[in-house]
Amino acid sequence: MHHASLTKNLTHLQRLEAEAIHIFREVAASFSNPVMLYSVGKDSSVMLHLAMKAFYPAPPPFPFLHVDTTWKFREMIEFRDAQAREKGFELLVHINEDGVREGVGPFSHGSNVHTHVMKTVALRQALDKYKFDAAFGGARRDEEKSRAKERIFSFRSAQHGWDPKNQRPEMWKIYNTRVSAGESIRVFPLSNWTELDIWQYILQENIPIVPLYFAAHRPVVERDGMLIMLDDDRMKLRPGETVENRLVRFRTLGCYPLTGAIESSAADLSDIVEEMLIARTSERQGRAIDRDEAGSMEKKKREGYF
């Protein structure tokens, strides 16, 4: 039967789902030691759901790695542990202990150094420690300009570096999975999804997500044009700052001092989808790490970031 006739009756989300499942299976068949990066955000939750579907009724044939910067929202960590318990997947948590010993944090060292040491270096440490040859990530092309030119199979050097000029063509959904000794790939099954696709799929499949994505009254302080939630007592107020209880939610999740909330009353999934339909800003506008300097995401990716 002709391929087109097999796919013409699929909905937009079914096509995206089928593509992602195909990518998961391709990697599982081609690599000896894959891992899925589990950051606990909405994209990770969709990836987890797709991975469970791809290999059902067997569990996914790879562990899930969480790079813990020690500054994640507490609700994210609670959700991560609950999901691992409920779904029964193998969860690996890696913290850059050198960074902890040196006291690296977003307040003391700034977002640039904190992200490099506690995320990028920590990720490289974990990939080296477990000798993973392929790592799934939840990055999407619509998020940010350096990710827009990223391949689905992103080849990395033995030092985990990304050279955008040295990537392979991906015609007709045919992927070249060959790597030399020491090299690895980062794989992005959600490359062609948009933020709206993600939310519509979460709604359709009823995928559990961290409650921080839903609007609630939360203690926030306005700092550098962002609404930062006070998640623990490590965040000290600057002169003139006041804590306000505002109705907010998060479009994107990361380290709490670097993640801005948005004022919103979207309290359930259908509210969020409705809000996304009229949104005119990128979700990563709420990420301080992407504002460090022009082209900063590409710079981080070249150093080994996702």
UniProtKB/Swiss-Prot annotation:
Pathway: Sulfur metabolism; hydrogen sulfide biosynthesis; sulfite from sulfate: step 1/3. InterPro entries: PAPS_reduct_dom, Rossmann-like_a/b/a_fold, SO4_adenylTrfase_ssu, Sulfate_adenylyltrnsfr_sub2. One of its GO terms (biological process) is hydrogen sulfide biosynthetic process. GO terms for molecular function: ATP binding; sulfate adenylyltransferase (ATP) activity. It is an enzyme of class 2 (transferase). Keywords: ATP-binding, Nucleotide-binding, Nucleotidyltransferase, Transferase. It catalyses: sulfate + ATP + H(+) = adenosine 5'-phosphosulfate + diphosphate. Belongs to the PAPS reductase family. CysD subfamily. HAMAP family: Sulf_adenylyltr_sub2. Heterodimer composed of CysD, the smaller subunit, and CysN. This is Sulfate adenylyltransferase subunit 2. The gene is cysD.
